């Protein structure tokens, strides 16, 4: 990515951060190393095929790709376009527009904007729609109620939200679709009750961020400074997808994995639009170094136990056939199902077993 070369140095990728991560306390699992040191390149179709193969093998229904559009300028669009150009990569997918400014916050604790998220005019909305349309019309694209599923990360940041989404719906119907099924990610905010909440069919409880918003203050015993060294479509679909705490320069914050999951499982759907979330792990040390947020006590066995409970929760309380998972390959934030050197395929096996024990495994492939 030319912009990454300019902003972070020649040859920079997310793997650069992952490789350079260092533990901040005894027993801290850093750096995270992909199994067989598979630091793949997502501009290589072989990597996409590998991801799709293992995802399907272990029961993942599909992927949700982050999409970056800045008034016609795109970043990191190649993997999604490569997916489109290679129909043999046989995995359902949908798109989430990650509509935020890009800043240097995680690297330098700076609010300097690298590229500003703007929303353009009607002409830009039209261009954006027709870029997305080619994906919406792909046979692998995920549909709900006969409409392509499109997620918006931060709808409250879009000043012309109603005008834009209604225009896109109009264009969709003019181009052979029944419209667009809009979703948004509930993080530390809730757009459902906003005056544009009616535009959305679904709201995703993005975890673990949502549970922090739901319970803004973790009790002291559940939140503490880490001590540094020196001072599923028949059945459930698993679709694979910051803190506001004051931290000192050397004070990563640790959370208890078990407690976070217990809180997630205690959440009741606020309305019929709510879609439950799940998370495998979270540790953004590769990006934030000694200012990271870290979950402790993570194991494949615990993940399997809690995911199985969330599947039942989704089915019986939310009445939904999908869960959005953080994440497939967010290595820079410790959220990944992909195999690593510590657990091998442990997290993917946990997904498979959780689906099987709850009767939601569509095809047994192991």
Q: What annotation goes with each model-predicted range?
A:
Residues 1-366:
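Glycan-processing catalytic domains of CAZymes
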């Amino acid at each position: 990515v030319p912009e990454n070369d300019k902003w972070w140095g020649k040859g920079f990728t997310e793997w650069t951060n992952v490789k350079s991560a260092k533990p901040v306390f005894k027993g801290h699992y850093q750096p995270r190393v992909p199994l067989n040191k598979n630091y793949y390149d997502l501009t290589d179709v072989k990597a996409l095929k590998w991801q799709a193969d293992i995802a399907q093998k272990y029961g993942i229904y599909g992927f949700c790709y982050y999409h970056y559009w800045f008034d016609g300028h795109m970043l990191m669009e190649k993997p999604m376009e490569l997916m489109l150009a290679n129909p043999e990569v046989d995995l359902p997918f949908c798109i989430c527009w990650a509509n935020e400014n890009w800043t240097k916050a995680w690297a330098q604790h700076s609010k300097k904007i690298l590229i500003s998220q703007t929303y353009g005019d009607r002409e830009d909305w039209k261009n954006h729609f027709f870029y997305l349309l080619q994906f919406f019309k792909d046979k692998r694209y995920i549909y709900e109620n006969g409409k392509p599923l499109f997620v918006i990360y931060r709808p409250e940041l879009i000043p012309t939200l109603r005008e834009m989404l209604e225009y896109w719906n109009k264009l969709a119907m003019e181009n052979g679709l029944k419209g667009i099924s809009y979703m948004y990610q509930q993080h530390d905010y809730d757009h459902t009750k906003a005056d544009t909440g009616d535009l959305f069919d679904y709201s995703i409880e993005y975890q673990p961020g949502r549970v922090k918003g739901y319970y803004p203050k973790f009790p002291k015993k559940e939140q503490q400074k880490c001590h540094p060294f020196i001072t599923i479509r028949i059945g459930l679909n698993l679709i694979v997808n910051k803190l506001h705490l004051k931290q000192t320069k050397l004070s990563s914050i640790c959370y208890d994995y078990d407690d976070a999951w217990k809180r997630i499982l205690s959440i009741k759907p606020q309305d019929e639009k709510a879609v439950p979330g799940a998370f495998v792990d979270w540790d953004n040390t590769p990006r934030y170094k000694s200012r990271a947020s870290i979950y402790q006590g993570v194991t494949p066995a615990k993940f399997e136990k809690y995911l199985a409970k969330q599947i039942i929760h989704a089915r019986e309380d939310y009445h939904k056939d999908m869960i959005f998972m953080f994440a497939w390959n967010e290595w820079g934030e410790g959220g990944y199902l992909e195999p690593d050197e510590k657990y091998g395929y442990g997290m993917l096996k946990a997904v498979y077993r959780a689906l099987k024990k709850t009767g939601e495994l569509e095809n047994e492939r192991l």
